[in-house]
């Protein structure tokens, strides 16, 4: 597993040996960031405008990829000890990488919504819906925030009340749901 783009391209990332952590593949990350970069260009924005939140961060590969591509800051929410150990090691070479050791279904309050949220919860545990609702309640997102949720293809994409789907992409056995908060 490695960073696939930006100034840290090719940097190898440490991954835990446990079965619980399932990093987003290099191919899916590369596709995701091609989509995000295109979206930013259409909205006349740059990566340097973006505060990125990687929820259920695991190794931190997605949030670190955002930093490698020039994001202003990446925040990581993780509470699984083996994943945290890898995340801390992987993030050590990056400025503006901030780890929040917390349960994403009960995040801390913030008064500063982020621009992009990526969420890759353990499959079939119904955690992403709870986390999305909690992030909304605790101030992490607003109508401008783009949310990407990685789920297994067989999972239903029933968004919590107050959110709408803007895109849905399949990558092997995984899907990426792109959504926003209703205005």
Q: Residues of each region from the PLM?
A:
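Class I S-adenosyl-L-methionine-dependent methyltransferase catalytic core
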Residues: 1-183
């Amino acid at each position: 597993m490695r960073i696939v783009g930006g100034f840290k391209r090719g940097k190898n990332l440490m991954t835990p040996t446990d079965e619980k952590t399932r990093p987003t593949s290099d191919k899916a990350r590369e596709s995701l960031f091609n989509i995000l970069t295109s979206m930013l260009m259409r909205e006349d924005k740059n990566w340097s405008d973006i505060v990125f939140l990687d929820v259920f961060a695991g190794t931190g590969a997605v949030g670190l990829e955002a930093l490698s591509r020039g994001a202003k800051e990446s925040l990581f929410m993780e509470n699984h000890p083996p994943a945290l150990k890898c995340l801390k090691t992987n993030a050590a070479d990056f400025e503006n990488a901030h780890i929040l050791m917390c349960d994403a279904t009960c995040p801390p309050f913030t008064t500063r919504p982020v621009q992009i949220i990526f969420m890759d919860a353990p499959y079939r545990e119904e955690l992403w819906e709870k986390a999305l609702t909690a992030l909304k309640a605790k101030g992490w997102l607003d109508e401008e925030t783009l949310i990407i949720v990685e789920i297994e293809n067989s999972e239903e994409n029933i968004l919590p009340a107050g959110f709408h789907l803007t895109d849905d992409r399949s990558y092997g056995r995984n899907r990426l749901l792109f959504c926003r908060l209703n205005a």
